[in-house]
Amino acid sequence: GIFSNMYXRTPAGYFRGPXGYXXN
């Protein structure tokens, strides 16, 4: 989603946030 575009997606399909990984 929005955060995926901001932080880039990981192979797992989650987004990388400033505090780590979170579900998308």
UniProtKB/Swiss-Prot annotation:
Keyword Metal-binding: no
Cell compartment(s), UniProt: Secreted, Cell wall
Main location: secreted
UniProt keyword Secreted, yes or no: yes
Tissue and organ expression note: Distributed in the epidermal cell layer of leaves and in the subepidermal layer region of stems. Not in roots.
Transmembrane feature ranges: none
GO cellular component: extracellular region
GO biological process, one term: defense response to bacterium
Keywords from the UniProt entry: Antibiotic, Antimicrobial, Cell wall, Fungicide, Plant defense, Secreted
Known role: Antimicrobial peptide. Active against Fusarium spp., Gram-positive and Gram-negative bacterial pathogens.
Family recorded in the similarity comment: Belongs to the DEFL family. Group IV subfamily.
Record's protein name: Defensin D6
Species: Spinacia oleracea
Species lineage: Eukaryota, Viridiplantae, Streptophyta, Embryophyta, Tracheophyta
